[in-house]
């Protein structure tokens, strides 16, 4: 017998029982995005490798260790996208969407990173991202955060996420801070682990979010990034904080929050949770005013975020068990007896015409009434429509409320109206 071929480690199948809750969560997210006037953009999952090297930064874990990169048959270096912002910016430049324009965009889909698979972190994972172009004030930063806060309320998880904020200033301010931080780290080099020693000269700000407890203790005495901010960045951050306070959104300023990608400036933020074991990031983003120009476009202010859907689904399931998937089926059509199947299928098509949006499944494969009602229960149907030989002969159907057990014989022409009343 041939050996079974299994999924690649860290790249998961999502089965019907799981995709149902994903669909409900994604529907909730998309409804909120629509209420803010954001438009979907669909992007390739494969891009030219230099796009990510230029956008993310060559001296980052993503580029150095995690990207899935390969040569195609033409010898071009291609990469499965590890994140969505770079591709969105590339598309905006390529199609003339950005210069002297405002765009509020969102995208959803799989991303790929070669990481050690663990709960909520996989090699193929799914993100929903938002990107706004052409607006440079703190008000749009605040709107994005307010949008995410509305998501948490709609999903019933507001009490389980907290907002952390920081400003990492301008490029010049970060360069000055980088020099001060490197000088401090050099004085305490013996207390750094090997990873931090490597980052100290290549990407020293990444030392700030080291997970090593000893390094975190050392950083208590390090220079503070906030002390090196330029005045414009200070005013921008103060404006953002004031807007969030006016909106009733609580936050904590975390001066060690820097984000893992090189393109950020000024505002950075993360929504974090402790409800999945160790602290985990649910949603993160910030401002990246230099990235469009860095990738070949005209200078354009920009801000955005990305959210990992696997982790969000886990969080919703962990803290809000009342948030359940919608049933697969609203109505199950039961048919038993000689020559009833064609009549049942014809009635089903008529009901689908008259009740758009209602999910109706017709029984196939035969079976007595008991077996068919068991199938209706399995699929979560609220109502059964029953056709037997006598109903076909009389032009009627029996409509049964599967919750109360009440059933009524109804003329087939009136079945849709009766169902509309039952289903609300």
Swiss-Prot record:
Subcellular locations according to the entry: Cytoplasm
The gene designation is: hisS
Organism expressing this protein natively = Escherichia coli O127:H6 (strain E2348/69 / EPEC)
Q: EC number(s) of the enzyme?
A: 6.1.1.21
Q: How does it assemble?
A: Homodimer.
- Matches recorded under HAMAP family: His_tRNA_synth
Return one Gene Ontology term, BP aspect.
histidyl-tRNA aminoacylation
Which reaction(s) are listed as its catalytic activity?
tRNA(His) + L-histidine + ATP = L-histidyl-tRNA(His) + AMP + diphosphate + H(+)
**Among the entry's GO cellular component annotations, what is one?**
cytoplasm
Which protein is depicted?
Histidine--tRNA ligase
């Amino acid at each position: 017998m041939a050996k079974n071929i299994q999924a690649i480690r860290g790249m998961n199948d999502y089965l019907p029982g799981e995709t149902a809750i994903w669909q409900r969560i994604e529907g909730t997210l998309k409804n909120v995005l629509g209420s803010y006037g954001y438009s979907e953009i669909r992007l390739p999952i494969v891009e030219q490798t230099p796009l990510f090297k230029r956008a993310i930064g060559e001296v980052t874990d993503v580029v150095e260790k995690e990207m899935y990169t390969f040569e195609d048959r033409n010898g071009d270096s291609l990469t499965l996208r590890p994140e969505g912002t770079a591709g969105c910016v590339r598309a905006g430049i390529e199609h003339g969407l950005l210069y002297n324009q405002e765009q509020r965009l969102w995208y959803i889909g799989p991303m790929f990173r070669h990481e050690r698979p663990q709960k909520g972190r996989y090699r193929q994972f799914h993100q929903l991202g938002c990107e706004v172009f052409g607006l440079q004030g703190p008000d749009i930063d605040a709107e994005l955060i307010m949008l995410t806060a509305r998501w948490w309320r709609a999903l019933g998880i507001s009490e389980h996420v907290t907002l952390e904020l920081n400003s990492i200033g301008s490029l010049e301010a970060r360069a000055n801070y980088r020099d001060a931080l490197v000088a401090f780290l050099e004085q305490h080099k013996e207390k750094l682990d090997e990873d931090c020693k490597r980052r100290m000269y290549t990407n020293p700000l990444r030392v700030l979010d080291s997970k090593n407890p000893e390094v975190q203790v050392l950083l208590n005495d390090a220079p503070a990034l906030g002390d090196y901010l330029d005045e414009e960045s200070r005013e921008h951050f103060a404006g953002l904080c004031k807007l969030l306070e006016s909106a009733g959104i609580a936050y904590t300023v975390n001066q060690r929050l820097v984000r893992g990608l090189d393109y950020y400036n000024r505002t950075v933020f993360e929504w974090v949770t402790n409800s999945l074991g160790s602290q985990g990031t649910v949603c993160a983003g910030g401002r990246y005013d230099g990235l469009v120009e860095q990738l070949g476009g005209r200078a354009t202010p920009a801000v955005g975020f990305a959210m990992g859907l696997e982790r969000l689904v886990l969080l919703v399931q962990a803290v809000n068990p009342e948030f359940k998937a919608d049933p697969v089926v609203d109505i199950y059509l039961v048919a038993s007896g000689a020559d009833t199947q064609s009549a049942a299928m014809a009635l089903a098509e008529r009901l689908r015409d008259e009740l758009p949006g209602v999910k109706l499944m017709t029984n196939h494969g035969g079976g007595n009434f008991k077996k068919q009602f068991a199938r209706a229960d399995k699929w979560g149907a609220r109502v059964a429509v029953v056709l037997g030989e006598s109903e076909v002969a009389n032009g009627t159907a029996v409509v049964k409320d599967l919750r109360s057990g009440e059933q009524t014989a109804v003329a087939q022409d009136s079945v849709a109206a009766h169902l509309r009343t039952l289903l609300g």
